């Protein structure tokens, strides 16, 4: 029983590695937004909604990884 519990915790820990990718993706999105707005401030209204969409898509992958880790801990 202890071996199964340890395997669940190890699997949940490994599945949270995807959160690292989400964090890097969000950083890249907003770095590109800052770079674009600093080059041409008049495009702020055009670039900001695209940045929010990129943020949402990057964050969704992180939330899926977090959901899998919770499923491994509590449901399996």
UniProtKB/Swiss-Prot annotation:
PROSITE patterns: ATPASE_C
Site (Reversibly protonated during proton transport): 59
Presence of the UniProt keyword Transmembrane helix in the record: yes
Localisation: Mitochondrion membrane
GO-annotated biological processes: proton motive force-driven ATP synthesis
Keyword list, A-Z: CF(0), Hydrogen ion transport, Ion transport, Lipid-binding, Membrane, Mitochondrion, Transmembrane, Transmembrane helix, Transport
Transmembrane segment boundaries: 14-34, 52-72
Gene3D superfamilies registered for this protein in UniProt: F1F0 ATP synthase subunit C
Membrane topology reported for the UniProt record: Multi-pass membrane protein
GO cellular component, one term: proton-transporting two-sector ATPase complex, proton-transporting domain
Keyword Ribonucleoprotein belongs to the record: no
Superkingdom: Eukaryota
Pfam families assigned to the protein according to its UniProt record, in alphabetical order: ATP-synt_C
Function according to Swiss-Prot or TrEMBL: Mitochondrial membrane ATP synthase (F(1)F(0) ATP synthase or Complex V) produces ATP from ADP in the presence of a proton gradient across the membrane which is generated by electron transport complexes of the respiratory chain. F-type ATPases consist of two structural domains, F(1) - containing the extramembraneous catalytic core and F(0) - containing the membrane proton channel, linked together by a central stalk and a peripheral stalk. During catalysis, ATP synthesis in the catalytic domain of F(1) is coupled via a rotary mechanism of the central stalk subunits to proton translocation.
Quaternary organization: F-type ATPases have 2 components, CF(1) - the catalytic core - and CF(0) - the membrane proton channel. CF(1) has five subunits: alpha(3), beta(3), gamma(1), delta(1), epsilon(1). CF(0) has three main subunits: a, b and c.
HAMAP family per record: ATP_synth_c_bact
Protein's name according to its UniProt entry: ATP synthase subunit 9, mitochondrial
């Amino acid at each position: 029983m202890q071996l199964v519990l340890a395997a669940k915790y190890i699997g949940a820990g490994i599945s949270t590695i995807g959160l690292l990718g989400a964090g890097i993706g969000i950083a890249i999105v907003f770095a590109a937004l800052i770079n674009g707005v600093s080059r041409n401030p008049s495009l702020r209204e055009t670039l900001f909604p695209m940045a929010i969409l990129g943020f949402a898509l990057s964050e969704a992958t992180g939330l899926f990884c977090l959901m899998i880790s919770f499923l491994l801990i509590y449901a399996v």
